[in-house]
């Protein structure tokens, strides 16, 4: 059924197709239809971050930026859902066209630019949802906020989403907001992490519970840079790392239609680069922080590959666009077939 739906959706522009898909998934969730259309994944419970996940396969941020289809995605069999990236104030994002399919490579290029309706809209949608599973909320900075003041935007969002999130992801790795990736390095990273940790401690006292913080990083760093990030996360007391965001590289899409568009590349071509980042992180972290792996999972075996590389959880986005909900079950089954780790 999804193959037919995809054929119809792919006749539309990528962004129109995306918006229509969110509407349809949301409507299916309200009517309780989505769970009838997809096989329930095998039970594969896992405990990470002090949270209980029914399975380790989640929805990556970016697909449901505004939380408009939480219940719909919640009925498809995901072990957890991450919504956003959301910013303090609504913003339109970059000019269109800004989203491009590369079906020959099972890939997508986007330069969306954190288009979203703002954190208050997202929270209204979260509070209206019936979903009670693990919900991550991904936060970012507004386009017109100087990078030097980025911490202010992150703290505004953290204050607002804290009570409603199972965990919060801090996005410092989107390539589509100028200067954002500089926050992954040196003193900028340390200052951001210190501010986040201090605010997390204050919010934990206020709300009576500690909400984990995850930092989402790029796949385009050197091994040495990745190691420095890992050390900074441990030193600052962060709770998890998500590896990875989209890549600025174009390996695997050279010469394809839209292959030279500006923006972040996701899907199959980023798989090896993302998995390598997971391996480097796993070696540096030694189990001190859990890794949530994202990037290039278009088959069940790719999800298992991420877990074998050292991840505790995985997320899918582009693979979901190309393969639909069946990929969730496929990924869970592939992970379940891995030898058990002590």
Curated annotation (Swiss-Prot):
Signal peptide stretch: none
Pathway: Pyrimidine metabolism; UMP biosynthesis via de novo pathway; orotate from (S)-dihydroorotate (quinone route): step 1/1
BP GO annotations: 'de novo' pyrimidine nucleobase biosynthetic process; 'de novo' UMP biosynthetic process
Protein's membrane topology: Peripheral membrane protein
Active site residues per record: 174 (nucleophile)
Cofactor needs: FMN
Reaction catalyzed: (S)-dihydroorotate + a quinone = orotate + a quinol
Similarity section: Belongs to the dihydroorotate dehydrogenase family. Type 2 subfamily.
Role this protein plays: Catalyzes the conversion of dihydroorotate to orotate with quinone as electron acceptor.
Protein name (record): Dihydroorotate dehydrogenase (quinone)
């Amino acid at each position: 059924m999804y193959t037919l739906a995809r054929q119809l959706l792919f006749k539309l522009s990528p962004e129109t197709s995306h918006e229509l898909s969110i509407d349809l998934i949301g409507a299916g969730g309200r009517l309780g239809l989505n769970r009838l259309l997809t096989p329930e994944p095998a039970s594969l419970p896992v405990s990470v971050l002090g949270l209980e996940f029914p399975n380790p396969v989640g929805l990556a941020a970016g697909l449901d930026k505004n939380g408009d289809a939480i219940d719909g995605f919640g009925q498809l069999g995901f072990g957890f859902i991450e919504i956003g990236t959301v910013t303090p104030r609504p913003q339109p994002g970059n000019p269109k066209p800004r989203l491009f399919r590369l079906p020959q490579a099972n890939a997508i290029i986007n330069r969306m630019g954190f288009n979203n309706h703002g954190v208050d809209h997202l929270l209204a949608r979260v509070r209206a949802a019936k979903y009670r599973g693990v919900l991550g909320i991904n936060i970012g900075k507004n386009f017109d906020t100087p990078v030097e003041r980025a911490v202010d935007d992150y703290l505004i969002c953290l204050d607002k989403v804290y009570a409603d999130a199972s965990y919060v992801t801090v996005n410092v790795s989107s390539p589509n907001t100028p200067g954002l990736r500089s926050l992954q390095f040196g003193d900028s990273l340390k200052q951001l992490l210190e501010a986040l940790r201090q605010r997390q401690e204050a919010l934990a006292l206020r709300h009576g519970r500690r909400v984990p913080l995850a930092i989402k990083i790029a796949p385009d760093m050197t091994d040495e840079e990745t190691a420095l990030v890992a050390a900074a996360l441990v030193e600052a007391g962060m709770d998890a790392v998500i590896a990875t965001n989209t890549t600025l590289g174009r390996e695997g899409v050279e010469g394809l239609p839209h292959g030279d568009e500006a923006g972040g590349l996701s899907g199959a071509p980023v798989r090896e680069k993302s998995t390598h980042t997971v391996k480097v992180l796993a070696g540096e972290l030694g189990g001190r922080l859990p890794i949530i792996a994202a990037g290039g999972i278009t088959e069940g075996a790719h999800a298992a590959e991420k877990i074998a590389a050292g991840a505790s959880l995985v997320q899918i986005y582009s693979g979901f666009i190309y393969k639909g909900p069946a990929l969730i079950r496929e990924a869970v089954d592939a992970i379940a077939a891995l030898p058990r780790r002590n």
